[in-house]
Amino acid sequence: FPDARCAEIAATETPSGIVAVARKPAAAAAPAGNADCVLLDGVQDPGNVGTLLRTAAAAGIRQILLAPGCADPWAPKTLRAGQGAQFLLDIREGIDLAAFLEGYAGQGVVTRLDAPATL
């Protein structure tokens, strides 16, 4: 594949030179109410979402729930930051996190940028 053609069709400024076509994996029927998971709420930067997905995959967490308003986990910049982690994860988009947490039986750790205190 010529570099010029790759640069022409790439969605990023510095394409890696690798081109592939892949299907978006189907999510399971319903989020598990007790599995380890990462919940993302309001994370709008594609690079940050990709990094969080990559970190979750490295930690062995497979379920990722994104609230409305998060960056698209399948956007080119998110895929690049995720380095393929998306294909190891069960990613759910548009999740009502409050409703999910009502039935969640696992333990949780909450972090937020605007919290009044640190952990």
What kind of region is each of these model predictions?
Residues 13:
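Glycine/small-residue-rich phosphate/adenosyl-binding loop
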Residues 2-7, 21, 25-116:
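RNA substrate-binding interface of SAM-dependent RNA methyltransferases
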